[in-house]
UniProtKB/Swiss-Prot annotation:
Residues 1-27 are annotated as: Left arm. Residues 1-19 are annotated as: 4 X 5 AA tandem repeats of G-Y-G-G-L. Belongs to the chorion protein family. One of its GO terms (cellular component) is egg chorion. It comes from the Eukaryota. Keywords: Repeat. GO terms for biological process: chorion-containing eggshell formation. GO terms for molecular function: structural constituent of egg chorion. Residues 97-110 are annotated as: Right arm (Gly-rich tandem repeats). It comes from Bombyx mori (Silk moth). This is Chorion class B protein M2410. Sequence repeats lie at residues 1-4, 5-9, 10-14, 15-19.
Amino acid sequence: YGGLGYGGLGYGGLGYGGLGGGCGRGFSGGGLPVATASAAPTGLGVASENRYEGTVGVSGNLPFLGTADVAGEFPTAGIGEIFYGCGNGDVGITREGGLGYGAGYGGGYG
């Protein structure tokens, strides 16, 4: 529209689709950086060449999130499984740092 419309320098100034700031990276699927640190030991390992018969249980508290791994072969006449639980299943972000909202609206809404 003569260089002043939606695709030019903005909508009556420097807004829509032109040089205006705001509503940018926060709404474009950018990353969410997360850094965690554990005060507790970072691993738990149970390793043995022995044969376990019956139920083997390991319990305790792990920080935030954890993993479980089984290596080896299970005999076809028996069963093998991992029952792994972490809290009540709710994982949430309790605090965020950083810049917060975008830079604001463009200067050309008028």
